[in-house]
């Protein structure tokens, strides 16, 4: 069995150490002025790590979207006031089973790219489609700027399959 902290056989890691360090730093920054926020951030980080470090398996698209919501709340704690988030209701998701991280990984890459490009807010909207999700990123403060669209397919296994 692989060690989830050390990573996978292909050299990838289920969790970015850089991300975890940044979330812990964000939580530390809230301790004195906003202790409830600090506790919430640490609880969300615990949920995030629990989901990502459980090992190889598949989950429902709804469970993965719930995990994506946790991830996005952690990013909002790291970048206060910079991320607006819109997620579809779980009932609108396709009935698919996917690997944990199949949605969060491309989403985190896109968010990181957009946050580093320039200061300002970034709106992140995921919309359910029959066979996946559409990710839309844009800057609400700059309506004329072209946004970015990314298609995230969700079709690993039929909903009735178990692994």
Q: How would you name each of these model-derived features?
A:
Residues 160-163:
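C-terminal end segment of the histidine kinase catalytic
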Residues 1-15, 19-153:
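Two-component histidine phosphotransfer core
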